[in-house]
Amino acid sequence: MRRRNLIITSDSDSDDGGGGGGAATASTPASASASASFPSVSGGGCGDGWPSPQNPRSVPVQFPSPSSPPPSPPIEISDEEEAEAEVVVEEEEVVVVEDEEEEYEEVEEIEDPDGDSPFVDAPEHISPPPPPPPPARTPMPTPTPTPTPTPTRPPVPVWAAPLPARTPTPTPSAPPRAAAPSPAGTPSPSPIPPSSTPVSALSGPLRQVDEFLRGLGLRLRPEWLESCAAGVPGFYGLGGVEAMARRCFEQFLFADMNACGAGVLPEGVGSMHNAVLDGPLVLQVDEIVNLSAPLRERYRDAHAGPKRCLKLSMTDGIQRIYGMEYRPIKDLEVLAPAGFKIVIRNVHIRRGLFMLVPEVIEILGGVDDELDEARNRLVSEVNKPPRGKRKQGGLPLSSRATLAAWPTNANATNDAEQGASVPRTVNTPHPTRLGNASHASQVGRTTQPMVDNLIPHVVVSNAQEQSRHIQEITMQGQPTSLNRHNKEASASYRYNAQCSISGTTRAMADEHVLVSNAQEQSPHIQEITMQDQSTSLNGRNKEASASTSYRYNAQCSISGTTRAMADERVDPSFVGNNVHEQMQRVQGITMQDHISASSESKRELSVTTPSGYDSRLAPHGVGNTGTRSGEATRSSNVDDGINNIGHPISLCGENEKPFTYIFNMLADWGVQQDTVPYIQGKIKGLITSVKRFQYKQSMQYDLYVYIDDGSFITEAFVDRDIVQNMIGLSAEELAAALSSGGPAQANIRKTMKAFEHFLVNFEGTILIELNRDSSVPIVREMNKGCSSSDAWQLLRRVKTFSGQGYMRSLDFMDTTP
């Protein structure tokens, strides 16, 4: 039998309805059974495949649509109105066409292999098909399957007997398919009521509490209830079952339902379709995601409205189910704490997905600390500023966010190869607190864990161990020619040895821009200094004084030579594993070089961190704490190359370093913001992306970019003069040229394309400024590329780190993922 569909078309030009009436008369027998279900196919009903009210299906209520009007009643054609069937609504004509040329999208899902109509009215008593397949009836509750070991005729009346009693109960069963009678596609019948579940083996009061909570839609594990009762003082004396249940419920709000929930959802809820769960059902929301936004904007606050669609990941402790915000729910927030609890009643299910509307959900509150911390790490990773086109550990953003939320171990968050980089020192996309003292303290806290990995093992860890090494050097490393001097000379030598070790320590720490034990070393150095100076002042022997001066200069030479050798770091084996080997190697060089190195003795007692930028408001912001003058004259290959090139910034004036780091500038600005109006510094970095570029509204250039120098990623404002010099026009002239048209407009577009290309590929030195009036750094100068002197300086640092084998743990230079 060929299937026929009823199609209604309007014909305003027809003179009479004879043809249409004949067609209607002919189609009456074929369309009589399909008229009740016609709106679900053509979209006249609810439009989502639901049966019409005339069809006694298992679902009693249609799913409410938020935007469509109420469903119109289906068009029915009876035998009494065959003559008037052509007059329907505004001269509509009933035409019967065959299904060979017309295809519908929704018919494909429910096609019937036998050729009959796929919509069949369910009879009052559902009976199994003539060959009753036993697997198709397995979901139906049977009294006992033991009397019928094989599928024979006796089980048929046994199954048919309880069916009339179950017909009033709505079951979320899918439409019957003759081609797929397997039980796997049939969802579970109705949700199991709490009273039908077996009661756990609990004590008398706790059993009553468990039954009371089940009546509210909450099932908890017995061991959790017992631990809760044991942890609450005076639990059994609260005065009744309701009071004890309330106290357990309060504790449950701040617990993880994945560990304490016993499951309240029916089995196989994820495979249900066209079903309604009455509830109440208490669930936990582990995560909320805004599906209407891209990944980088998915974890940002968005108000409830037609443009927002939230996806909720929920659990009852046993099963995980997902819900979709079908209509705006004002009580739900994108950034709600993870692990809060909700109650759901009368929720509709489509393809295993809960369709959430304001009427079916109620927020109970609560939070799970572990889930919330993981979610905060994920949000921090997703909301980081863009990194440009550099590799991100070979992982996409979604995978890196997952690793950030649940790191495998404590070191995974600091490993750049794993892609998880949440604990790094990267600011938020909207840095508005650069000048706060709290920000400076945060930078200091972030710096502290890095110090232990950056200072090499050759640097003595604390003052006590350093003092012990100095005494051993004093007893073993004195030249034999100096043994004739008195006790004062020996004390002075110890002082000079201390100065040498502190110089070596300071040189290694300067290259890492951090000093881990300056506070511990300074008091000890001062103590030795005061003691040795008093010894020198009490001495009256002129020869002893001369030898003291000689040894002081010699040891300063040891310090300078050691620092130069550490800077070059070509041979890793040169640096010994302890101070004894280092001093024995350097003493031979020192005895020949002490005269030329005597000029280095002025700066040996200070332990400073070179910042490389001007905190005293110099015009170009390069500070006075750069490389030392003797460093370039004694170092071999690399430093000789620097001498031959000659850089006006790094080798003139007060011998500044070529560039500094944003990380250091932020730390220093947090300390000096109350005393100086601004600070400036040069960095070596690149522009990762452009955040905003406007010129029409305010008739002036507003260009915000993200810059990265390897230590920090921050938003920065580009000076308007730089933009105007690059484009060659003011903002007003640019707007007028773009709106004029003609050749001028084409030329301006080429200029803008060139400026865009410059920003995308920029990498060089940037002069930035931090002041009180701006919440973000200001770019004052931009010079693409770098000089050869800067490259040599950077190469020296890289060779220093690689020679010691610490590149893998060097988080200070690799803080961006």
UniProtKB/Swiss-Prot annotation:
Span list, region Disordered? 1-203, 595-639
A Pfam family this protein belongs to?
RMI1_N_C
Ranges of Polar residues composition bias in the record: 625-638
User: Transmembrane residues, as ranges?
Assistant: none
**Biological processes per GO annotation:** double-strand break repair via homologous recombination; resolution of meiotic recombination intermediates
Start-end of Pro residues biased regions:
126-157, 165-175, 184-196
Segments of skewed composition (Low complexity) = 24-41
One cellular component (GO) term of this entry: RecQ family helicase-topoisomerase III complex
Q: Which residues form a coiled coil?
A: none
Q: Which GO terms describe its molecular function?
A: nucleotide binding
Record PANTHER family = RECQ-MEDIATED GENOME INSTABILITY PROTEIN 1, RECQ-MEDIATED GENOME INSTABILITY PROTEIN 1 RMI1
Q: What does this protein do?
A: Essential component of the RMI complex, a complex that plays an important role in the resolution step of homologous recombination, in a process called Holliday Junction dissolution, to limit DNA crossover formation in cells.
The record describes its quaternary structure and partners as: Component of the RMI complex, containing at least TOP3A and RMI1.
Q: What is this protein called?
A: RecQ-mediated genome instability protein 1
Please report the organism this UniProt entry assigns to the protein: Oryza sativa subsp. japonica
